[in-house]
Amino acid sequence: VDQLVGQYMAHLCGLGYLGDKKNIQTTMKSIMKYNFVEDFSRHFNNMRSYVMGDEAGLLMASWPKGRLEVPFPYFSEVMTGFEYCAAVGMLYEGMEEDALTCINAIRRRHDGAKRNPFSESECGHHYARSMASWSAIIALSEFQYSGVDKSMKITDRPGNYFWSNGYSWGTVQVTEDDVTIEVING
């Protein structure tokens, strides 16, 4: 699920593609096809269970052609930080529906009734890897900021977007005809 984490970071940093775009898109589609499970009721996991019963999630690993004799630890688990990275990778590859399916599965698991919505525990409560969720905001808004060029870039897709650059933050409203930037602080 995390084999393209370098590409994920390259996109977030505005570096573009590290490899062939077609191969990266194929890999993201394969991750969704083979690793996303709609219902874990019949899924065996001998390690920790961060997903149970009729919940959905993105497995750490899958073997469509047969499992390794000695797989790596945690292969049959889901972990929100890895799921968010994969989902954001899907956003960058134009797979918005699949990405939001993954993100919604996480949010449904952490709905406040079954699990704490403010502590997506992986290796303990408040584990930092789940902060990767914030990168979905950057991917959906196509936000890029350069302190060197003193420039900010945002999508032309109509909507309201959050932005921040380390010095200030606010919102951007994009319409068919206009872009309105509001600085809330900074």
Which stretches of residues belong to each language-model region?
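Extended glycan-interaction surfaces of carbohydrate-active proteins
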Residues: 1-79, 111-113
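Non-catalytic C-terminal accessory modules of carbohydrate-active enzymes
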Residues: 52, 83-186
